């Protein structure tokens, strides 16, 4: 096998676009997405996800297309499509199936004198999916045999949206493939952009499992801190003081309790529990952690109602402002946002619930309260956008005299509210 002379990235979302741009600086690269509008916008230098600057896109040599034929003769194909869950929390492999079928169709038309292409999957999934689900689809559509006519590989994405410190270049890349030779080639390709280095897993299933457990671990740790924060609250203990004290021990790992949303941490555990069930194992601890984090919206809603009543007021006579609607801070991604779920839940009990997020459109439901000097009975800091956390005093000023400030982000120091008459509560 030879080192590939070109790369095609299938799927230009939050993961695929930065990846394709990085490779384009090193080797001829095509970025494919079946969303023609997405391609048109990118050709104009517009990333609707607000992750990549316009000048970076327009200055790149990346070839952008929605034409499937671009995949046909590529030597190295990388798949970065989303892998969500269904409404009943089962793996939703629809996009993975579609991408695999498309690649198979295109490989059927491949020139016979070209070497077997390497097809790398980066999408998070359960152990065995690449070889047992994706591979057979490509075989069926292409008429080629996996491991001969094309080579499967897996290198889990480790993108942390909005994080300028942990990037493609600074995070070790895990790679794997059907053969040792192919794994070596995959590693050499990724070393071009992964300056932190490459870790070669012994097989594809191991690499798949490594990605899933990364997010399962984080989900469980946050669940532990969420549950203990609620316990300590009932005891009248400030959980942040508890965690700070415990953190003085060298082997205590600290996490911030809060809402767990998005398309990775609250999704990936279900891929592992699904796979566990297929081999006859009930993953009770993982599912318990998921239950804790999924129930935080309702628990916080009830807690705020309790705070309002303790102040002598009624929720149905209370006006609320929720700051932040994306699933995490400083990212323009609203998918599976628990802040949005909290908004819906509180709208059932409170007189009015307004929201503001700097990453949302400037419509009637997203008016900047800082510009109109509005005041609210309850202000909930749900997402720690820099616009909010850099001006906590302005957030405090949004609360009416004797009102309530709720911090779900851990960004507000209690001392910042000491000189006011408002009631302050945080996880």
Q: Where do the PLM segments sit?
A:
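Structural/interface elements that position substrates and couple domains in central-metabolism enzymes
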Residues: 1-427
């Amino acid at each position: 096998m030879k080192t590939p002379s070109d790369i095609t990235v299938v799927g230009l979302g939050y993961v695929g676009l930065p990846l394709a741009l990085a490779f384009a600086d090193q080797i001829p690269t095509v970025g494919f997405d079946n969303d023609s509008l997405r391609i048109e916008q990118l050709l104009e230098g517009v990333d609707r996800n607000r992750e990549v600057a316009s000048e970076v896109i327009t200055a790149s040599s990346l070839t952008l297309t929605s034409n499937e034929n671009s995949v046909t003769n590529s030597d190295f194909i990388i798949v970065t499509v989303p892998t969500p869950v269904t409404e009943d929390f089962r793996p939703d492999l629809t996009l993975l199936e579609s991408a695999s079928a498309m690649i198979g169709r295109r490989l059927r038309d491949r020139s016979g004198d070209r070497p077997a292409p390497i097809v790398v999957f980066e999408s998070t999934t359960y152990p065995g999916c690449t070889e047992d689900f994706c591979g057979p689809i490509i075989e069926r559509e292409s008429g080629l045999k996996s491991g001969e006519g094309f080579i499967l590989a897996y290198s889990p994405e480790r993108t942390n949206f909005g994080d300028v410190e942990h990037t493609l270049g600074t995070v070790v890349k895990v790679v794997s493939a059907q053969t040792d030779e192919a794994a070596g080639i995959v590693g050499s390709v990724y070393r071009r952009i992964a300056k932190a280095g490459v870790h070669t897993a012994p097989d594809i299933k191991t690499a798949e499992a490594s990605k899933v457990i990364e997010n399962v671990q984080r989900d469980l740790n946050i669940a532990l801190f969420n549950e203990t924060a609620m316990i300590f609250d009932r005891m009248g203990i400030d959980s942040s003081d508890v965690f700070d004290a415990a953190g003085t021990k060298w082997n205590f790992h600290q996490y911030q309790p809060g809402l767990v949303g998005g398309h990775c941490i609250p999704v990936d555990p279900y891929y592992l529990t699904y796979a566990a069930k297929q081999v006859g194992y009930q993953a009770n601890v993982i599912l318990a952690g998921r239950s804790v984090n999924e129930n935080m919206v309702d628990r916080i809603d009830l807690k705020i109602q309790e705070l309002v009543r303790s102040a002598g007021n009624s929720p149905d006579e209370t006006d609320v402002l929720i700051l932040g609607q994306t699933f995490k801070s400083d990212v323009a991604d609203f998918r599976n946002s628990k802040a949005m779920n909290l908004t819906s839940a509180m709208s059932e009990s409170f007189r009015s619930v307004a929201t503001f997020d700097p990453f949302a459109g400037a419509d009637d439901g997203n008016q900047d309260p800082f510009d109109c000097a509005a005041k609210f009975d309850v202000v909930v800091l749900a997402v720690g956008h820099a616009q909010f956390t850099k001006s906590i005093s302005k957030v405090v000023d949004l609360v009416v005299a004797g009102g309530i400030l709720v911090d779900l982000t851990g960004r507000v120091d209690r001392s910042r509210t000491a000189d006011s008459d408002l009631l302050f509560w945080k996880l």
